[in-house]
């Protein structure tokens, strides 16, 4: 490999390259009913909102009954970034609470909760019911069940990659998925007479299963929860030992300083990555040394599902190899 001269050149170029700022993540917000505007009622609602956010961060709907969680939620008001009162759909009073992301993730680590950190890519949903594409109304229950656990299901637009190609994890279909939807995650399904056939695509991995129900709404909601269960199992990481762990990551198809800057920003914004250090470069690829709070395989799988990167052929000296898509 070439010496680090090229890496230094790229670093110099980034000084004049703008990197888009990330949007505020809804993972750290929750709206809950509140009994009134008194401090006591507000603090009780804030604790409930913090529990809802921990569900979103961990993907575990039963997080509130985990050991130590109820006690820890008593300090939730100290973690609040902002809040405001709103009116619910039935006229009830609601409290919309935003928490400090670092404070909430720190709380989750202290409670030893597995966390799938932000930013999370959306999950494209391509489902046919009795041969016809499912519309937004039919998928409302699935979308709502995912949102409660911090997963955004999105519907395809015209020109979406062929469902068959996505479900088969074909490289071209996954690259189009990344370019068009900014994700490497998809749920492809067919329902016929209540029987469901499902494939969840996570980066370059496909998982398939069957379901049976006499109720289409129930089978869709169950499929959404099953997909979230699999996503959480794949991407949510428990706290690492104090010393962390090291790994070598190869990123290929970097053809400009702006792409290099985008990769570095993506890695440095991941709370599981303590440090990123360029080691060597060759052609349009870069070898990076990472210090992590989670296994590199877990982090790399998340990166491959982010819509920015796809799995690549193994490279010398790298534990994991990825190619830049956009």
Please describe what each predicted stretch is:
Residues 8-18:
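Bacterial N-terminal signal peptides
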Residues 46-68, 119-170, 263-287, 304-305:
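N-terminal segment of the mature soluble domain
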Residues 28-35, 177-224, 298-300, 320-326:
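Amphipathic beta-strand/beta-sheet edge segments enriched in Tyr/Trp
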Residues 25, 44-59, 111, 148-150, ...:
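C-terminal/domain-edge helix-coil "capping" segments
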Residues 19-23:
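Sec/Tat signal peptide C-region and signal peptidase I cleavage site
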Residues 66-125, 137-140:
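Signal peptide-directed extracytoplasmic domains
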Residues 33-37, 78, 88-90, 98-104, ...:
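Solvent-exposed coil/turn segments that connect beta secondary-structure elements
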Residues 78-85, 152-157, 166-199, 303-319:
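A short, hydrophobic beta-strand-centered structural micro-motif
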């Amino acid at each position: 490999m070439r010496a680090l001269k090229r890496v230094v050149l790229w670093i110099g170029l980034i000084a004049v390259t703008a990197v888009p700022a990330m949007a505020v993540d809804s993972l750290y917000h929750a709206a809950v009913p509140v009994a009134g505007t008194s401090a006591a009622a507000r603090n009780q609602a804030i604790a409930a909102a913090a529990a809802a956010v921990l569900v979103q961060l961990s993907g575990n709907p039963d997080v509130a009954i985990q050991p130590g969680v109820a006690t820890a939620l008593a300090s939730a008001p100290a973690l609040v970034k902002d809040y405001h009162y709103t009116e619910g759909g039935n006229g009830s009073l609601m409290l919309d609470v935003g928490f400090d992301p670092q404070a909430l993730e720190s709380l989750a680590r202290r409670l030893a909760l597995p966390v799938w950190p932000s930013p999370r890519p959306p999950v494209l949903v391509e489902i046919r019911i009795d041969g016809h594409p499912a519309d937004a109304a039919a998928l409302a229950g699935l979308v709502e069940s995912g949102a409660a656990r911090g997963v955004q299901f999105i519907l395809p637009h015209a020109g979406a990659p062929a469902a068959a190609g996505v479900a088969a994890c074909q490289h071209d279909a996954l690259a189009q998925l990344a370019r068009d939807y900014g994700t490497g995650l998809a749920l492809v399904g067919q329902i016929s007479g209540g029987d469901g056939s499902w494939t969840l695509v996570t980066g370059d991995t496909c998982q398939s299963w069957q379901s049976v129900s006499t109720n289409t709404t129930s089978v869709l909601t169950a499929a959404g929860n099953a997909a979230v269960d699999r996503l959480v199992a794949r991407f949510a990481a428990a706290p690492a030992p104090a010393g962390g762990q090291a790994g070598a990551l190869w990123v290929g198809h970097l053809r400009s300083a702006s792409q290099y800057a985008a990769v570095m920003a993506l890695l440095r914004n991941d709370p599981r990555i303590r440090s990123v250090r360029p080691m060597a470069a060759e052609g349009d690829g870069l070898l990076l040394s990472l210090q992590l709070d989670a296994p590199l395989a877990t982090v790399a799988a998340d990166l491959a599902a982010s819509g920015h990167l796809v799995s690549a052929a193994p490279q010398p000296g790298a534990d994991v190899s990825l190619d830049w898509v956009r």
